[in-house]
Each structure stands twice: as C-alpha cells, then as structure tokens.
Swiss-Prot record:
Residues in the Cytoplasmic compartment per record: 1-9, 177-446
Keywords for this protein: ATP-binding, Cell inner membrane, Cell membrane, Kinase, Membrane, Nucleotide-binding, Phosphoprotein, Transferase, Transmembrane, Transmembrane helix, Two-component regulatory system
Residue ranges of every copy of the HAMP domain listed in the record: 177-233
Annotated disulfide bonds: none
Membrane-related topology note: Multi-pass membrane protein
Function, as annotated: Member of the two-component regulatory system PfeR/PfeS. May activate PfeR by phosphorylation.
InterPro entries membership: HAMP_dom (IPR003660), HATPase_C_sf (IPR036890), His_kinase_dom (IPR005467), HisK_dim/P_dom (IPR003661), HisK_dim/P_sf (IPR036097), HK_sensor (IPR031930), HK_sensor_dom_sf (IPR038428), Sig_transdc_His_kin-like_C (IPR004358)
One Gene Ontology term from the biological process aspect of the record: phosphorelay signal transduction system
Membrane-spanning intervals of the chain: 10-30, 156-176
A GO molecular function held by the record: phosphorelay sensor kinase activity
Topological domains, Periplasmic: 31-155
Protein species of origin: Pseudomonas aeruginosa (strain ATCC 15692 / DSM 22644 / CIP 104116 / JCM 14847 / LMG 12228 / 1C / PRS 101 / PAO1)
Uppermost EC category: transferase
Name the record gives this protein: Sensor protein PfeS
C-alpha cells in the first residue's frame, strides 16, 4: 500500500497556507484595524487634562463649580458633558435625566478603541479624576474632531489584499520549487538520455534522496540510466571480446582445413574447436543475460552436500580425479535458500577452475559454517594462488592472469559471482596456505 508522501506534503502545505491566511485576516488584520480606532497619545492627554480641571473645579467650589465647568466644557467642545460620582450620580447642581443616565450604561476608557455606536452616535468616554479616582469622573461624548479615522482604504487594501496576494505568491513559489524545478531536472535528464548522452551529469543527490514520488522517479531514472550505461558497455565489451576470442579458434580451423590431417584426426580437431567456440558463446550469453536482465530467480531450500556430490561425480569423470581428492566437510544441516541450477552452475565453474589450477596430487575441499542467517562456505584448492592485487581482477569478464593464458576464456568466475549475487549472496577470493580460497556467502534456509 502506497503512502503517497507527495500528496500529504502538498495537503499539509495547503492546509498551512489556509490557516495562515485565516490568521492573517481574522487576527492580524483585525488587530491592525483595531489599532486604528485608538486615541492618539496627544488626544488622551488632552482629555485627561479636562478630567484634572473638572476635579479641581469640583473640589474648590463643590456642586456649583462642577456645574459651571460642565457647561463651559460642553459649550467649548459642543458636546455632552457630565461629572458623576462613584454611584453615577451627578456632582453638579443639575441631576441627570433618564436619557442622560442611559449614556452611562456603556462608557469607554481612554485606552479603549473608539468608534461610533449604533445609529451613528459618538462614543461616551469615562475619565477618572486623576487625584482621587474613587470620588468621581468626567464623562464626555467624544468630540467629532477627536474620533479616530479608523481603517483607511489603503490600510484595508494592504491587510486584506496585498499581503494575502504575497502569501499566495509565496505558496506558488514553494510549489514551483518543490514540484516544477525537480520536474524540469528530470525532463533535462530524460532529454540527455534520449540524445544518447549517457555519461551526462547525474541528478543531484537531494532530488534522488527525496522520500516521495519525485524521489522514487529520480531513482528509477538514474537506475535506468545506469542500466543503459552498463548495457552499452557490455555490448561494446561483448563485440570487442568475441571478435578477439573467436579469431584464435577460427584461425585454428583454417589451419586444420588447409592441413593434410587424416579424416579422423581432422574430425576430432574440428569437434574440439567448435566446442570451444560454442562454450564461449554460451558463457557470453549467460553473463550478458545476468548482467542486463538481473532476473529474480525463485529460491528453494537446497542441501549443499548433495550439490557437491553431484558436481564431484561429474568432475571426477571428466578429469580422472579420485573422489577422495574432492572432500566435503559439510553436514546435512547445511541447507541454503538458493536457486538450485544457478548455484550448481556457479559451484561447477569454481570447481573446474580449482581443478585446472591444482597440482597433480592436489586436493580441492569444501567446508564452512553458519554465521547468523547465512552460510559461509569455503572452496579451497592447493594451486599456486593469486597475487593479492589480482584477487578482484579474476572475477572480471574475459580477464585471464598471465600464467593462465590460453586456458579458458576468463568467464567462469565472472558467471559464478553474478549467479551468487542474484541470489542475495556474495563471492570473493583470498589466498590460502597454499592455493586459492573462494568464499561463498549464501542465505541460510529457514
């Protein structure tokens, strides 16, 4: 079941954008709008000074002073004014009417936002006496000239138009960088492959390392490019090697054809040369198939001892060796999870190679032990061994050491390694004491 990480990334990005836009409009935008409804510091000081003057008049002259100041301020600002006590009673000589008392039901302080009330009525501001706030306050209907202007069309455009547009543009940029830029790189890479530019610069590591569909696509594209490079290299190597390797048997066939050998000897010579060419072609096709197709081979539990015994019988028949020279120290508990035919082919190549390089009275043995979920098998011969710097070279196709020129085509070990690796195992070599030791690392059967 696919998790669709790219879908979740895009969904999360869009949800985050919607939440940010909602916060912008309903929190930041409203906060900016509310900030335009507060009195300016100078206006606050101006009204607070009226409260100080009202307190002074009331304390000096009592109700008469409060009434006089109320009338003067009302006439000066052309607005409604009242001086009230702690219980909202009038401090002047004129009591408040019912309508005037209704103005006191919702009064605003100087640091509150100011806006028109219902029916376009100016707000009423309550300003406590600065000296003794518990004894009274000045209540004044805010003069028209002091009413804050509120949200201007330009501010509204910035908070509800320009900034959201910039956020939308930022979202588009993020989507472009997250989607379009990688797609452009993938397109350029595909165009390079279409133009046979197989050695062009591979995709950047961050793109191939992405844990989403685009990262998987980049990995698949690079895998395809690598397969194409390997296929092309193998084709070139195949053509170059076949053209070189076939020259020798063809030349020998030409010599045999032109010679005056007896018919029976000529037939044997032709059979040997044709067999060599057939073996070369079969091995080359096997190696090319494993390298290019990389098949998923079905596996089964296999008893390693049984495979060795079958190979030993064939090897003894072909080489004339005594079976005692091919001992196996594995028990019936050595069961590996492999493809039987591929393992048999690989071990046959290894055994033939070991016999070919063994001395006349030498032995080739097979032993091993289980290490965790794998079996570590060792095929040991008593031949001359291989130089340390050549231990990896012997597994390369068509590679023959100087002292083995003319023996085989250099494909046996390469085919064996490919066959083992296709089954999840490993094959490597080390020098024994004496001879060469070939190590097989195979999955253990459950």
């Amino acid at each position: 079941m696919r998790r669709h990480p790219l879908l979740w990334k895009l969904a999360l990005l869009q949800v985050g954008f919607c939440l940010l836009l909602t916060w912008l409009i309903y929190t930041w935008g409203l906060s900016v709008e509310r900030s335009t409804y507060f009195l300016a510091p100078a206006d606050r000081h101006y009204l607070a000074d009226y409260a100080r003057q009202a307190e002074d008049a009331w304390r000096r002259e009592g109700a008469a002073g409060a009434e006089r100041f109320r009338k003067e301020l009302s006439a000066k600002e052309d607005t409604w004014v009242a001086l009230v006590g702690p219980h909202l009673e009038s401090l002047g000589s004129t009591p408040l009417s019912a309508e005037e008392s209704s103005h006191l039901t919702f009064m605003r302080k100087l640091d509150w936002p100011m806006s028109r009330r219902l029916q376009d009525e100016l707000p009423y501001v309550s300003i406590e006496f600065p000296g003794h706030p518990e004894q009274g306050r000045l209540v004044i209907q805010l003069p028209e000239r002091l009413l804050p202007g509120g949200l201007t069309p330009w501010t509204h455009l910035v908070t509800h138009g320009i900034v959201p547009t910039l956020l939308a543009a930022l979202l588009g940029l993020l989507l472009y960088r997250h989607l379009v830029v990688p797609l452009n790189r993938l397109r350029d890479r595909a165009d390079a492959l279409r133009a046979d530019e197989l050695e062009s610069t591979p995709l950047a590591a961050p793109l191939a390392a992405r844990r989403d569909e685009l990262g998987e696509l980049a990995q698949a594209l690079e895998h395809m490019a690598e397969r194409l490079r390997l296929s092309l290299a193998q084709q070139r190597l195949l053509l170059r090697t076949l053209s070189h390797e076939l020259r020798t048997p063809l030349a020998r066939l030409r010599i045999a054809h032109d010679s005056e050998l007896p018919p029976e000897q000529l037939r044997q010579r032709l059979d040997r040369e044709i067999g060599d060419m057939q073996r070369l072609l079969e091995d080359t096709l096997d190696l090319a198939w494993m390298d290019t197709e990389r098949p998923q081979l079905p596996t089964e539990p296999v008893l390693a001892l049984s495979v060795w015994e079958a190979l030993r019988d064939d090897a003894c028949f072909e080489s004339g060796w005594d079976p005692a020279r091919l001992p196996c120290r594995l028990g019936v508990d050595c069961r590996v999870e492999v493809h039987l035919d591929s393992l048999a082919q690989a071990m046959e190549n290894l055994l033939r190679n070991a016999i070919r390089h063994s001395p006349e009275d030498g032995t080739v043995s097979l032993d091993g032990e289980r290490e965790g979920d794998f079996w570590h098998l060792r095929l040991q011969d008593q031949g001359p061994g291989v130089a340390e710097d050549q231990l990896e070279r012997i597994f390369l196709p068509y590679q023959r050491l100087d002292d083995s020129a003319g023996e085989g085509f250099g494909l046996g070990l390469a085919i064996a390694r490919r066959a083992i690796e296709l089954q999840g195992g490993r094959l490597w070599a080390s020098n024994g004491k004496p001879g060469l030791c070939l190590h097989l690392w195979l999955p253990a059967a459950a």
